[in-house]
Every structure is written in C-alpha cells, then in structure tokens.
C-alpha cells in the first residue's frame, strides 16, 4: 500500500478518513488524499471534509490528490477529487504533483503506480537532505521444510444454505443463493453489503505452482524490509500464500509488462511485450483481462523468481456483495444472490474464474466464511417512512438488494403497517433467468410489490431492456415522482446504470418541458435524496 511503501522513503505514514482530518490537516508533512465520488457527491466518510473546505479555511499544506472513477459516468467523472484538489489549492495549499486519475474501466492500477512513483520521486527531490531512503530489496523468500498454521484472526460467519438458482448455460453464468449466519454481534440494515474475504481458485493457484516448479506443500519463510501484507518470519506453505494473500487474476499493468520485457531473453517475445505495453494495451490486455501469470505462461523466456513474482502482486482484496434479505426476516442471517463467473479466458490461457464468486459457490453448509457487514450509501436503504413509494430497477443478480426491500415491505404489511407502492422493473435474458419468481408472485399477491419484467432474448412489442419498460411507463413514473417516490437502480454500470439515467433525463425533459441540460440538472438534484444507484463494473 501507499502507506507501507512510504516507510521506504523515510516517512512514518498514518491512514485515516477525510472526515477525521477536518480542522487539523498537518502542515509539517505531506498530505496525500485518495478519494472517489458517489453520483457526483462525496463518499460517506468525506462529506464533512468537503463541507469544511467550502468554508475556505487557511490550509498552507503540501498535498497531492488521486481520484478514483469510472469513465462511463461522464457528468460526474472525478468530480469530487477535482473539487477537493481545486479547493485546497485555492486556500493556500501547494500541490506536490498534479492530481492523479484512476479509471475503473481502464488501467486503474497502472495509473496509480505511475502517479505513486511520480509522487515519491518528487518527494525525494525535495527532501533528500533529511530522509533515510531504504533501497534494499523489499521481499526475500527462503524455502523451508517445517510447517505452521496461518493463524489468521478474523470474524467468521457460517454458511447455512448454498443452492443453485439457475444453472450455467450458453447465454449466462450460474446463479446461486446463499444464506449466511453473521459473526456474533454483527447487525445489518436492508440495502447493506456483506464484505467477504475469499481465497483464489485452486486451478489458478496450481498454475502458479507449476510455473515456478513448486509443490503445494512447499513451505517458505518471508522476510521484508518494510511493512507488508505477507506473513513474515515464520514458515507458511506456498499454496496458502497464493490462495489467501495475493490477487492472481488482476490484469497486468503497463509498467509490469515493461518489467517483464526487461527480463525476457527471447528478442521476438521482448518486442511483442513492449508493443503490448503501448497502444494495444487496452484491447489486448485490459479487455482480455490478461494477468501477470498469463504473460509468464505465454512468454516463457521471461526469467522471474517466485519472490519477484509475489512483489508484483497486490494484496487479495475484500469483495462486497449486496445483501438480498431484510433483518425483519432474520436479523442474524443474510442472504446473497450471486453470478458464478467461470468462462474460457479471453487471454487464451485456461479458464477465467471470478475469485469471490467461485469461492462462495464452493462453500458447503456449516463452512466458516471470513465476512463482515459494510454499510451501503446512506441513500440506498428503504425510506424510513414506509408510506413513501419506491421504484426499483434491476437486471440479473442486480435484483439482490431489492429482494431485501420487498421482503421488508412484506414483513411490514404482516405487522399491519401502512406501506406505499413498490414497483420493480426487472430485466433478464430469458424467463429461465427470472430469479425468485415464486417469492415475487407471493409478495405481489399481498400488495408488497408490483413487478414489471422484460426479457432481452424474447423481445415483445419492441421492449428489450429495463429502460424500455420505464420509458413505456413514463406517465406512471411521472405520477410516482409527484407522489414523492424514491428511485433505486442496481446492475451493471456500463449497461443498466447509464441507460436508466439517460431514460430518466428524457422523462424529465417531457415532464418538465425543458431541455436536456436542465433535465440533467434536475436528475442530479434528485440524486441527493431521491434517485440512488448501486452499480458494479
């Protein structure tokens, strides 16, 4: 991480939320800000910080900003990182380097690596007189023969059920439903996430072991000259390191390709690699999700040690899934609704396995699972006033949070509560992909939801996608808007999220008799409290 690497350059770095820095940004050390936007608004733990900056305090700090975003969200792309950068500069701050910009639809990690290197290079130039720079190798590995357990201490849930909803077929992946008992003391709200720490698929781990001529029970001892996410100074199996500590399938960055080209001893392969780090990178690497391992297998003349390989890999990341249940159903158990990604690799090497989805798919009843609750954005929950109408738009497993919303409304009806209308616009490829059809029918009969469905492989009356249904119902949507309804979307950022936004702009244009720009502004204002999107890349 950035903080751990800072120690290599003589800095003792600390990490905290932006809100925690309100009123006391340090002036005696560099301030590095990494942040994103949520529908053009600050993240939950940055709202107070942004409001603080807008009071124009005196901030004579040295700072740098790196923003995270997704280029498909054109109107709000890096809006908050840019705003923070400009506000600090206008209140006395001095930029260490220009703002960095990571694109989740592009070479995000490559962009971050380049920005990080520029940051540390600039800091070194300014502070070489009083910084003790560590230049020794950061990671060394010794092959040993003794054994020791991992001993990781984390919160564990227990798998109560794991069933297939839809088998994998030629047009889509397997879909599964899991029920998980939460770790002791954890609670959740409808619309929250379950954060899961997975392990890598055995098939991919085996490929790495084969590439480096290691057996699964080979034990290593890792020593590091700086902070590291690896377990250090005691023996651990190579299998455990590869399965539980590093990302094996993340696309290789341009910089990493250049590193491999430098250790490639076949001239033809070296030329090809340098080309891949150039103009063809996005098409041949990013779009095909080619990993470091894929490159090592495709270009065998690359000479890389196991330690060098591990140094190229980021820490295994926690994945989060929308919870598809309500605590009114069971406050100690959550359900997940997932796609299981297992397809031929676009790189041409083996299969591409979704790390977390395959981990979850292979769990058995009574298995323990490393997990915890993570709160969703404050706006992505059912209204506290149950009488407020809600309109939900989803495709595929994007129905997950809305199953929880509807389950909650059904439970409230049983308790005699007055509830507003709930309308679900749901898109699937075929009728066989229609998830929770029986439950939705039951909930519709008791008045908890009205379901509008559409099937992209069975176009009817010109309607193919969710946005087609929404546009057809635009007069009803307008009435629901006038009645104070809240609108929610969950699904693919590139497909559903962007399309629904475009559709709503058109509806507002017609409803308010205004132009596209004015309609877009109205929708932006709605995003503050009435129009919420939870999308995945």
Q: For each predicted feature, which ranges?
A:
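FNR-like FAD-binding dehydrogenase module
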Residues: 1-537
């Amino acid at each position: 991480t950035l903080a751990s690497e800072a120690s290599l350059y003589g800095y003792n770095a600390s990490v905290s939320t932006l809100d925690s820095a309100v009123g006391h940004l340090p002036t005696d050390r560099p301030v590095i800000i990494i942040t994103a936007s949520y529908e053009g608004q600050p993240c939950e733990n940055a709202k107070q910080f942004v409001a603080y900056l807008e009071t124009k305090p005196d901030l004579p700090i040295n700072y740098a900003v790196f923003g995270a975003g997704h280029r498909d969200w054109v109107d709000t792309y890096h809006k908050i990182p840019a705003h923070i950068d400009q506000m600090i500069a206008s209140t006395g701050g001095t930029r260490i380097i220009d703002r960095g910009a990571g694109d989740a639809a592009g070479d995000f990690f490559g962009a971050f690596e380049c920005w990080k290197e520029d940051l540390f290079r600039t800091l070194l130039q300014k502070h070489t007189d009083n910084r003790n720079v560590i230049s020794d190798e950061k990671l060394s590995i010794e092959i040993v023969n003794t054994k020791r357990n991992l001993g990781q201490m984390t919160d564990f849930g227990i798998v109560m059920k794991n069933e297939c909803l839809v088998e994998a077929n030629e047009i889509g992946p397997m879909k599964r439903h899991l029920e998980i008992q939460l770790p002791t003391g954890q609670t959740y709200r409808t619309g929250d996430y379950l954060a899961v720490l997975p392990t890598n698929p055995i098939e991919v781990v085996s490929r790495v072991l084969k590439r480096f001529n290691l057996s699964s029970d080979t034990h290593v001892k890792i020593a590091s000259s700086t902070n590291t996410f690896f377990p250090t100074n005691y023996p651990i199996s190579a299998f455990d390191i590869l399965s539980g500590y590093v990302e094996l399938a993340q696309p290789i960055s341009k910089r990493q390709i250049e590193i491999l080209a430098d250790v490639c001893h076949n001239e033809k392969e070296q030329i090809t690699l340098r080309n891949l780090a150039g103009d063809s990178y996005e098409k041949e690497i990013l779009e095909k999700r080619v990993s470091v391992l894929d490159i090592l297998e495709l270009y065998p003349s690359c000479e890389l040690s196991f330690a060098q390989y591990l140094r190229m890999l980021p820490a295994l990341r926690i994945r989060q899934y929308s919870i598809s249940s309500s605590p009114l159903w069971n406050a100690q158990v959550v359900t997940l609704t997932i796609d299981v990604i297992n397809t031929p690799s676009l790189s041409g090497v083996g299969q591409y396995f979704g790390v977390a989805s395959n981990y979850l798919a292979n769990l058995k009843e009574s298995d323990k699972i490393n997990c915890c609750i993570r709160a969703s954005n404050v706006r992505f929950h059912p209204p506290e006033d149950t009488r407020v109408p809600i309109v939900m738009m989803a495709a595929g497993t994007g129905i997950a949070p809305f199953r929880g919303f509807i389950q909650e409304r059904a439970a409230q009806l049983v308790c005699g509560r007055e509830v507003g209308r709930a309308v679900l616009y749901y898109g699937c490829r075929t009728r066989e992909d229609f998830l929770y059809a029986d439950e939705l029918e039951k909930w519709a009969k008791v008045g908890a939801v009205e379901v509008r469905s559409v099937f992209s492989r069975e176009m009817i009356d010109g309607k193919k996608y969710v946005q087609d249904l929404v546009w057809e119902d635009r007069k009803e949507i307008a009435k629901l808007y006038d009645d104070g309804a809240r609108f929610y979307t969950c699904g693919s950022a590139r497909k559903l999220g962007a399309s629904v936004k475009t559709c709503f702009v058109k509806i507002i244009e017609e409803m308010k008799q205004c132009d596209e720009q004015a309609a877009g502004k109205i929708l932006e204002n709605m995003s503050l409290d009435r129009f919420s999107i939870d999308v995945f890349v």
